[in-house]
From Swiss-Prot:
Annotated PANTHER family: ATP SYNTHASE DELTA CHAIN
Entry annotated with the keyword Cell membrane: yes
Protein name per Swiss-Prot or TrEMBL: ATP synthase subunit delta
GO molecular function, one term: proton-transporting ATP synthase activity, rotational mechanism
Function: F(1)F(0) ATP synthase produces ATP from ADP in the presence of a proton or sodium gradient. F-type ATPases consist of two structural domains, F(1) containing the extramembraneous catalytic core and F(0) containing the membrane proton channel, linked together by a central stalk and a peripheral stalk. During catalysis, ATP synthesis in the catalytic domain of F(1) is coupled via a rotary mechanism of the central stalk subunits to proton translocation. This protein is part of the stalk that links CF(0) to CF(1). It either transmits conformational changes from CF(0) to CF(1) or is implicated in proton conduction.
Annotated compartments: Cell membrane
Assembly and interaction partners: F-type ATPases have 2 components, F(1) - the catalytic core - and F(0) - the membrane proton channel. F(1) has five subunits: alpha(3), beta(3), gamma(1), delta(1), epsilon(1). F(0) has three main subunits: a(1), b(2) and c(10-14). The alpha and beta chains form an alternating ring which encloses part of the gamma chain. F(1) is attached to F(0) by a central stalk formed by the gamma and epsilon chains, while a peripheral stalk is formed by the delta and b chains.
Organism: Clostridium botulinum (strain Loch Maree / Type A3)
Lineage: Bacteria, Bacillati, Bacillota, Clostridia, Eubacteriales
Length: 179
């Protein structure tokens, strides 16, 4: 529902990062802030607490992050607090990462297998996907025993499902239809 808004915030920050030649630094800083927020119950409680004023929340964030992140990132965080969007920072980070990939002619491919891919399999998959999408492929591998066997690949909205679990489900559906 708020993807468009997340994208706009991310694009604004990305443009500032580009102007300052600090895209990698900003991405790294945002990841660190997201991890700190996710792993700190106290920060989450403060951000969610209705009786703590916005100005107090901004003061707390300034105290925590002043010397840890770039001033422009801190300003971005304070705007998100003001607009009550700080709890959705991770979504903005994901959008910023997508923008980074787009601008660098790259695309993320999520791959699920039961066992890790061999080096040759990984290289072949990257090559084939690169040819199909005409972009540099960033492979994100995940081990998932529930697929039983085969490989599942998601690139953007495209899904290539060659898993044994899906084949078995399809066979089961066909058998139930015949009864």
């Amino acid at each position: 529902m708020y993807e468009y808004l997340d994208r706009r915030y991310a694009l604004a920050l990305y443009e500032v990062a580009e102007e300052n030649n600090k895209v990698d630094e900003y991405l790294r800083d945002l990841k660190e802030v997201v991890n700190i927020i996710k792993n700190s119950e106290d920060i989450c409680k403060i951000l969610k607490h209705p009786e703590i004023s916005t100005s107090r929340k901004k003061e707390i964030f300034t105290e925590i992050f002043k010397d840890k992140v770039d001033d422009k990132i801190l300003s971005f965080l304070l705007v998100l607090i003001e607009k009550e969007r700080i709890l959705y920072l991770e979504e903005k980070l994901k959008e910023m990462e997508k923008i980074y990939l787009e601008k660098n002619n790259m695309i993320l491919a999520n791959v699920k297998t039961v066992i890790p891919l061999l080096k040759e399999e990984r290289e072949e998959l990257i090559e084939k996907l690169g040819n199909k999408y005409n972009k540099k492929i960033i492979l994100e591998e995940e081990i998932d025993k529930s697929i039983i066997g085969g490989v599942y690949v998601r690139v953007g909205d495209d899904v290539l499902d060659g898993t044994l679990s899906t084949r078995l489900k399809d066979i089961k559906k066909m058998m139930l239809k015949r009864e």
